[in-house]
């Protein structure tokens, strides 16, 4: 603990700049027009404003807490904690997979490097770094990469607009809106109030809710902040001021520029996820600009992957190794185990990334919302409501996950199944938790949390 808020703010911004932030928001721009990047931005930001009061409340109620599963263990018991542990690891694995897939697509699109090589080598690099440096290494490395990403964005966007011409982009978008024969035909492409874009924005809230609230990396950064005031300042600056402009720009500039030229999936692009690298390669050729863009995506993937792996270290060390493998483990033994598990998790991710060659980053992200949104209601309720019982928590998670998956696979309309599936995954558990708690006779004593002492050192 005791890391300054300025460092945490930079770290939050960079660790939330995923390959999906750059390439997925560009894909959203292709799909939903000028509203795509905007809806990506606000949808993915809202969960941080759920996380901030949650962590502030947790610091007050449970001062010695270092992982969210420690809280779950004390609040709901060991059984429910194991379930949340699985979800927490699942989020980490998914996010790492998304980074590997994105980096692999960029290296392949820009330089013709085999997808498998471009995806695996960066994962190997960040694994070795985090295994040696841990969380503090992750945060200070984030600061360096914060400046690299910012500089590349500031330089590249004006050059792209100058190369393509604002008038040409606008005229191309008008054709997208008015010409049914256009490969990207979308009557709402020039509307900020696009219905499809707004549905995607709501879906983005659901997707990010699970990714943020179940990602131990964000808890680790928040807990490492010097004070509650610094925490609030760091997360507001890191998300609203520093992060939100990036997907708005990527969706508007990369995504809309591509569709304005009549280029789309199957019509110049093998995948819609290639929109961002396509436009950069068009403008820069294979020169310095292309190298800059690859560097930016590489940095985004590295920092996000680093944050995930540091979170995996914390979860496995505090909530698995110490409890179930070696209860008498020293701090040194726990750290050694944490380094080993970093390599194991990364190895599994590398295999999955290779198998996902050719998949859309945006659709991967949307589907992940169904998987990880279900536990968030019981997590939030557990922080504030004493009448939410372990049985209610588990039942809500099972129902939310089942309803979301059923909707996604049963609804035949692919333009709406992802939206309904995500909403059900979030709202069904919320309704069950609220109604169940109202009629529950269970009561939890929150005073127990203040006396909690972890089995590992808290500095």
Predicted regions and their residues:
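Helix-loop-helix module between adjacent transmembrane segments
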Residues: 38-131, 203-208, 299-307, 338
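Hydrophobic, small-residue-rich membrane helices and short re-entrant helix-turn-helix hairpins
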Residues: 63-73, 134-144, 214-247, 265-268, ...
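Selective recognition of specific alpha-helical transmembrane segments in multi-pass small-molecule
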Residues: 86-98, 148-162, 198-213, 228-261, ...
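Transmembrane helix-loop boundary segments of multi-pass membrane transporters
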Residues: 27-42, 100-116, 136-145, 332-338, ...
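Loop-to-transmembrane helix boundary motifs in multi-pass membrane proteins
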Residues: 75-82, 93, 314-357
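Terminal cytosolic tails of multi-pass membrane transporters
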Residues: 322-323, 414-459
């Amino acid at each position: 603990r005791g890391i300054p808020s300025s460092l945490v703010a930079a770290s939050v911004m960079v660790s939330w700049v995923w390959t999906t932030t750059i390439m997925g928001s560009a894909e959203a721009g292709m799909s939903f027009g000028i509203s795509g990047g905007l809806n990506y931005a606000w949808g993915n930001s809202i969960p941080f404003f759920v996380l901030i009061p949650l962590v502030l409340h947790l610091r007050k109620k449970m001062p010695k807490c270092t992982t969210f599963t420690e809280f779950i263990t004390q609040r709901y018991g060991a059984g429910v904690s194991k379930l949340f542990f699985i979800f927490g690891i699942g989020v980490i694995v998914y996010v790492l997979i998304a980074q590997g897939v994105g980096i692999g697509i960029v290296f392949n699109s820009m330089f013709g490097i085999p997808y498998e090589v471009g995806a695996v080598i960066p994962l190997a690099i960040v694994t070795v770094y985090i295994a040696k440096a841990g969380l503090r290494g992750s945060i200070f490395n984030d600061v360096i990469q914060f400046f690299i990403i910012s500089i590349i964005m500031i330089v590249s966007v004006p050059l792209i607009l100058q190369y393509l011409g604002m008038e040409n982009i606008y005229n191309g978008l008008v054709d997208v809106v008015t010409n049914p024969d256009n490969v990207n035909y979308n009557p709402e492409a020039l509307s900020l109030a696009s219905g499809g874009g707004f549905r995607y924005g709501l879906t983005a809230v659901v997707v990010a809710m699970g990714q943020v609230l179940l990602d131990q990396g964000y808890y680790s950064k928040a807990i490492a902040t010097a004070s509650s005031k610094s925490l609030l300042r760091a997360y507001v600056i890191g998300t609203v001021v520093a992060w939100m402009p990036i997907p708005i720009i990527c969706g508007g500039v990369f995504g809309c520029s591509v569709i304005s030229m009549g280029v789309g999936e199957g019509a110049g692009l093998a995948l819609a996820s290639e929109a961002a690298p396509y436009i950069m390669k068009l403008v820069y050729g294979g020169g310095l600009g292309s190298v800059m863009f690859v560097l930016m995506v590489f940095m985004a993937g590295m920092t996000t992957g680093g944050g995930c792996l540091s979170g995996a270290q914390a979860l496995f060390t505090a909530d698995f190794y110490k409890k179930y493998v070696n209860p008498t483990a020293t701090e040194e033994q726990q750290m050694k185990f944490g380094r080993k598990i970093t390599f194991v998790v990364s190895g599994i991710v590398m295999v999955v990334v290779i198998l996902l060659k050719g998949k859309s980053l945006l659709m991967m992200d949307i589907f992940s919302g169904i998987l990880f949104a279900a536990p968030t209601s019981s997590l939030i309720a557990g922080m504030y409501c004493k009448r939410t019982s372990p049985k209610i928590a588990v039942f809500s998670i099972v129902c939310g996950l089942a309803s979301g998956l059923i909707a996604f696979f049963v609804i035949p309309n692919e333009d709406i199944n992802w939206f309904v599936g995500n909403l059900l995954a979030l709202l069904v558990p919320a309704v069950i938790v609220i109604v169940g708690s109202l009629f529950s006779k269970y009561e939890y004593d929150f005073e127990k949390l203040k006396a909690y002492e972890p089995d590992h050192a808290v500095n």
